[in-house]
Structure formats: C-alpha cells, structure tokens
C-alpha cells in the first residue's frame, strides 16, 4: 500500500525516497529548514553565497585551454533558462551550453522555438545529435524491458555534457536542482555536490546494464557516464546550481523564463497530466512516459507539481489531493498514438 508524506503528497513508491521518524520526506525537511529563524536563514544563505563565489573563482583559475568557465546542460526548458542567465548575468561567468537534442521528428515546435530564442539571447551552444536509429531502438527496448522508454535517453542527457566538459578541459558543470530537495529522491549529498547524480534511479548502471545489444562502442559512448576516476583525474566539479539560489522553484523558474521569451504548452491538464504547461515542452513522449510512471508507481507529474505548490503556499494539502485525483496520470490518446 502506498504511504504518503505527512505534510505533502510525496509517495513511498518513489524510487530512493526516505521518510524521517515523523513521516516527513526530504523535501519537507529541507523546506522546513528554510523557514527557521531569520538570523539562521541569513547566515545559511550568506554561507551558500560565499561557497558559490569560491567555486566560481576556482573554475576561472582551473580551466585549461578553454575560454569557457563552465558547462550547463540545457534542453531550453524553464530551468535551463534560469541557469543560463543566472550563471552569465549574476555570477558573471562565461558558460558553454550543451544540448543533447532529440531526433527532429520527436522535437516539438515549441521546443525548437525555445532553443532558438535562448541561443539568440547571446549564448554559445553545442548541440549533440545522437544516432537516431540507435536512439529509436533504445526507446522501443527500454519500454518493453524497463517500462520506461526514456531510460536510455536520460542517461545520455546526463552523461553527454560530462564528456564535453572533459574533452574541452572545462572544470565546472552545473545541473539544476538536487532531486532530494525537489522530489525527495536521495542518491547523494543533501548539498550542492552533484557527483552522486550517477546513482539516480533512471541512469544508474549505465547503458551496458540495460540488456540491449550494442553493435559498437560508439553506439553507447555518450550514454555512458564517465567514471569517477576519470572525473577526479580531470579535476571536474559537478554542482547543483539550484542549491545556491534562494527562490529556486519550478514555478518561479518558469515565470523568469517566460519573461525571457519562453513559450509553454497550451493544451489542458486533462490531456497532458501537467497543471501549468511549462515542463518538458520540447518532447511529447514525456507525457506518455509520465502516464506509464503513474501506472507503475501510482503517481505522475501532477503529484510532483503539487508538492512544490504546497511548499510555496499555493495549495493546501487537502486542495492538492483533489487536484491529484482529477489530473494525475492524465494523457490524451493523441500523444499515445503519436508515440
């Protein structure tokens, strides 16, 4: 039987989730810590600011044969926009954006427009397009074998930018949020250190443990997360940027992105299983995958959204329950047939 966090709606079926002795998930524990007395909060954020400034200075001094201070993996989604502008305009760093692109027929029109808009804001972007034949075979295989057609592609989304950082001698890479703080999936430190991301539910084990028969090494190179030994030898730091931004929330990131020209979905939640239409707009297959997640684990993307809404005070737990019952796991047949 599924159990839920006592203060939000985080389910016990979420991979790698933990609850404390009071029945609270890591997200609620973290959010509670942000609401402590003013002096403590002020001290904590001053400490985080000193830490990210120190990381910035370290990166600028340790880049080798590169004009770039850091890499930011991007999809041109709401979080990508927030990270790119924060790193360039607030931290005053020179980032190289790395996008692991979908095959053309999979990329949505909105997704392409959002990427075009981001590039035009003055960023250098490397776009990696993996072999679409292998990509599609992996989608089909992962759906049948793992019930998650995006399992392999998510490996590439996380691994490919690390390969670029190592190849270009760029010492620092930023991911967005620590999953333990946003959805309660703990697979590493509860800090800004992102080296533990390789233990995440979807990407752990790597492509060679999928059960898929690759014909040559180049077929899986960008799906394979570099070893800790290789990362350490090249002195690469991997950081959760969201840990250092006080108002890092998906909804606020979306508002920021929209002000920069980001476009969101216009379809209704009953068709998409997405309350606000600003998540994963570059790919419609994600909607089907969230539906499958709902069938497997008993929760979908709406649950993730209301957890954040509860913490921001947009919804009460009781209101969130009604919304989840109405929209979670929704997916129009048009998206299923498109897949």
Where on the chain are the PLM-derived regions?
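Short, glycine-rich nucleotide/cofactor-binding loops
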Residues: 70-79
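Hydrophobic positions on the alpha1 helix immediately C-terminal to the Walker A/P-loop
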Residues: 82-83
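Nucleotide-activated chemistry modules centered on ATP-dependent adenylation/adenylyltransferase
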Residues: 1-69, 86-339
